[in-house]
């Protein structure tokens, strides 16, 4: 029998969904605390930080300082995750307000660290396994599943390998066991994540690891829907695209950050790919029926000239991604691009503004294409007093958009789960829809 401590825990998980999985592992170890969103009343404040780019680092630092200012006397403030790991040699002196620091290797030991009130930094990066009990947050029907940690790519701008290490893939059986366990608890929709998902099992000498995973999930039949994030162009193949297309469970969702399209820029970025390869993959994705394609672009990488930017801009306008994330180059220590001559900030800002217009135009077109036709969706929960919150099955939670269903049009309350719905209008990134039937 699990006995609740008479203590409150405030968890703040910053950054990506991969960080969220690690936060949920820590919640699993701290199950006997009562969760609160109020920093001021918490006995333990746990901030799982992000240290990917400058803006994320600043957000993490500010969140820590705000918590330190607001915490009650005697409360324990903990900083875990990427920022702590990346700057572990200096962070203790830089932010003395923190009581416990830990990096990316000891999420499953957080309860011991709190009990002993001590820092801990293991050499090995933690990789969540099926036996690590997690408390899933934010949904009763959707969960993220991490399939690997680390990355073997050598992108000029990315510091992740310097603190997350080389690629280490989970065993396929461990993933299947976790999926089965979560599905039995009602999580019938999952998103599979990694730093480089398409390289899954490369470290074990297998080039078709992600295809194996897709087929094993299909055979298992524990889920009703799933999708994959973070395909890397050089390890993505036509066969992988075909496996996703033919899967009855995995949605035709393709998230592949290309970063650029110019061959000269791809070489400068050390992306180990080419425009021709990008186009081959992207055109194959677009040929898939009802495909949804998301990508990420970096603007202002050192030595990006006007011609290369214009080539990128023209391509993005022609290809029409459903969703597009656009980031300004962030100079990060321990990367090849850090010491290269920078593009002026004014130029970067102007380029981002131009690309954002293109991205918004095609995003709106993607939303409009859903109007007045039945789509498969996942109803998550009640949003306020009058609406249920839902999303297109191809979408990732909190990322690709939101669908609201007016409860006044319903004869009975909706349970979280899978439904066919009909969108009728949209504004910004929100669709309004009515329910047709469950499935």
UniProtKB/Swiss-Prot annotation:
Subcellular localization: Cytoplasm
InterPro entries in the cross-refs: Elp3/MiaA/NifB-like_rSAM, Methylthiotransferase, Methylthiotransferase_CS, Methylthiotransferase_N, Methylthiotransferase_N_sf, Ribosomal_uS12_MeSTrfase_RimO, rSAM, rSAM_horseshoe
GO cellular component: cytosol
Assigned EC number: 2.8.4.4
An annotated Gene Ontology molecular function: aspartic acid methylthiotransferase activity
CDD domains on file: Radical_SAM (cd01335)
Known cofactor(s): [4Fe-4S] cluster
Protein role: Catalyzes the methylthiolation of an aspartic acid residue of ribosomal protein uS12.
Catalysed transformations (reactions): L-aspartate(89)-[ribosomal protein uS12]-hydrogen + (sulfur carrier)-SH + AH2 + 2 S-adenosyl-L-methionine = 3-methylsulfanyl-L-aspartate(89)-[ribosomal protein uS12]-hydrogen + (sulfur carrier)-H + 5'-deoxyadenosine + L-methionine + A + S-adenosyl-L-homocysteine + 2 H(+)
Alphabetic keyword roster: 4Fe-4S, Cytoplasm, Iron, Iron-sulfur, Metal-binding, S-adenosyl-L-methionine, Transferase
Entry's family note: Belongs to the methylthiotransferase family. RimO subfamily.
GO biological process, one term: tRNA modification
Binding residues annotated for [4Fe-4S] cluster 1, in chain numbering: 16, 50, 82
Domain (MTTase N-terminal) ranges: 7-119
Domain Radical SAM core: start-end pairs: 137-368
PANTHER family registered for this protein in UniProt: RIBOSOMAL PROTEIN S12 METHYLTHIOTRANSFERASE RIMO, RIBOSOMAL PROTEIN US12 METHYLTHIOTRANSFERASE RIMO
Broad class of the protein's primary localization: cytoplasm
Binding site for [4Fe-4S] cluster 2: 151, 155, 158
Free-text comment on the cofactor: Binds 2 [4Fe-4S] clusters. One cluster is coordinated with 3 cysteines and an exchangeable S-adenosyl-L-methionine.
Species, as recorded: Helicobacter pylori (strain G27)
NCBIfam families named among the record's database cross-references: 30S ribosomal protein S12 methylthiotransferase RimO, MiaB/RimO family radical SAM methylthiotransferase
The name this protein goes by in its record: Ribosomal protein uS12 methylthiotransferase RimO
Class of the enzyme per the UniProt entry, highest EC level: transferase
């Amino acid at each position: 029998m699990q006995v609740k401590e008479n203590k409150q825990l405030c968890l703040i998980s910053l950054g990506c969904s991969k960080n969220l999985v690690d936060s949920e592992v820590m919640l699993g170890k701290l199950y006997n605390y009562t969760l609160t969103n109020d920093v001021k009343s918490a006995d333990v404040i746990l901030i799982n930080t992000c240290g990917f780019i400058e803006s994320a680092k600043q957000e993490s630092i500010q969140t820590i300082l705000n918590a330190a200012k607001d915490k009650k006397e005697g409360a324990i403030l903990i900083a875990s995750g990427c920022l702590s790991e990346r700057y572990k040699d200096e962070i203790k002196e830089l932010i003395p307000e923190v009581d416990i620091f830990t990096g990316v290797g000891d999420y499953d030991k957080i309860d011991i660290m709190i009990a002993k009130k001590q820092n801990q930094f293991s050499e090995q990066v933690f990789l969540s396994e099926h036996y690590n009990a997690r408390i899933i947050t934010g949904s009763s029907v959707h969960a993220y599943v991490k399939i690997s940690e680390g990355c073997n790519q050598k992108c000029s701008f990315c510091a992740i390998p310097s603190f997350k290490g080389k690629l280490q893939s989970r065993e396929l059986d461990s993933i299947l066991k976790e999926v089965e366990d979560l599905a039995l608890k009602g999580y019938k929709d999952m998103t599979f994540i990694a730093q480089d998902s398409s390289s899954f099992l490369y470290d074990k000498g297998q080039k078709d690891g992600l295809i194996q995973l897709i087929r094993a999930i299909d055979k298992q039949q524990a889920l009703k829907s799933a999708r994959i994030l973070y395909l890397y162009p050089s390890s993505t193949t036509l066969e992988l695209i075909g496996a996703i297309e033919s899967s009855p469970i995995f949605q035709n969702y393709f998230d592949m950050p290309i970063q650029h399209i110019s061959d000269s820029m791809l070489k400068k970025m050390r992306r180990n790919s080419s425009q021709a390869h990008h186009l081959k993959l992207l055109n194959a994705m677009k040929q898939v029926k009802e495909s949804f394609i998301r990508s990420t672009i970096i603007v202002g990488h050192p030595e990006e000239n006007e011609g290369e930017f214009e080539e990128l801009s023209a391509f993005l306008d022609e290809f029409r991604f459903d969703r597009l994330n656009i980031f300004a180059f962030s100079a990060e220590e321990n990367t090849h691009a850090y010491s290269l001559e920078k593009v002026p900030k004014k130029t970067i800002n102007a380029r981002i503004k131009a690309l954002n217009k293109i991205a918004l135009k095609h995003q709106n077109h993607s939303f409009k294409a859903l109007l007045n036709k039945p789509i498969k969706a996942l109803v998550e929960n009640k949003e306020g007093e009058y609406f249920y919150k839902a999303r297109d099955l191809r979408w990732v939670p909190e990322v690709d958009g939101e669908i609201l269903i007016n409860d006044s049009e319903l004869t009975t309350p909706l349970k979280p789960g899978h439904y066919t719905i009909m969108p009728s209008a949209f504004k910004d990134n929100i669709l309004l829809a009515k329910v047709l039937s469950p499935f």
